[in-house]
Amino acid sequence: MNLEIKKDLVSNWFKTLQDAFCDDICKIEKNKSQFKSTMWKKNIKKNEGGGEYRILQNGKVYEKDEGGGEYRILNNGKVFEKVGVNFSEVYGKFPKKFQKNIPGAQKDPRFWASGISVVMHMKNPLIPAMHFNTRYIVTTQDWFGGGMDVTPSKQDKNEKKEFHKILKNMCNRHNKNYYKKYKKWCDEYFYLPHRREPRGIGGIFFDYKKNDFEKNFKFVRDVGVTFQFIFNKIIKKKIKRKWTSKDKEMQYIKRGRYAEFNLLYDRGTKFGLQTGGNVEGILMSMPPLAKWK
């Protein structure tokens, strides 16, 4: 399959998924809270998004087009304290210091990348924070990555069991080895070494899925649809549960851990900031309120 066709298929899927997620979130909010949508353009010169810059070449001024995207954020809803759904499609060149860590980038530093990421911070502290992302990156090689994970502030053994059962069933539809492999990867990735504790109850995490585009794209689509099912299921089950000020305090402390991970270790945050992504979109994963003790 032609590479440009692959890019179009993937980016269109991510856009479709962004719309589907936002529609479901608005339904959960009963349309009383709305997303604020921001379109942005990649600006590698300033290392931030939301603007344009121009290049003088051969006596003429050209706009530097290196892609962009759209991030949608809903704040202070009845159910969601903060939720962000970000789509991006960017291209350019990896900085030299970054090239050795990216497959194919040392051979040629040019890249194209598209992705969707979602982070949900809930008003009810009995409903866990949830995170999802999938991406497709092209250098001289091309591959998929992504995953999902859940971070409760109050443990719920039944919820954890059900969550992992759904993930295992989804993975088994594609390969019997996926769940064990990607769960282990997730447990190792979403871990705070300085705290010696996991960020949450895990999930799946995968990267560098290449060599069979159609098979891998089918899996990536299933990951997106499964996350949509999971967040609806968890939220609707717990949306009316009563909580206390002590529960909220625990949530704030857990959010502090969440912020620590994203700023210190998260691969997507580092990638976005080092490749000229939109700062607001990259940091949308940060919780609205957090505490440290």
Regions found by a protein language model. Name each.
Residues 122, 129, 269-293:
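Long, contiguous binding/interaction regions
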Residues 98-100, 159, 215, 270-276:
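Short conserved micro-motifs at the rims of enzyme active sites and ligand-binding pockets
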Residues 82-83, 112-114, 143-151, 197-211, ...:
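Glycine-rich, often proline-containing surface loops adjacent to acidic residues and nearby aromatics
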Residues 140-184:
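Compact, glycine/acidic-enriched structural inserts
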Residues 170-219, 233-236:
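Long, charged, mostly alpha-helical binding arms that flank functional sites
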Residues 78-136:
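Long, hydrophobic/aromatic-enriched structural stretches that serve as scaffold segments
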Residues 2-103, 209-264:
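Gly/Pro-rich turn-and-neighbor structural signature
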Residues 6, 122-124, 138-140, 150-157, ...:
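A generic structural motif
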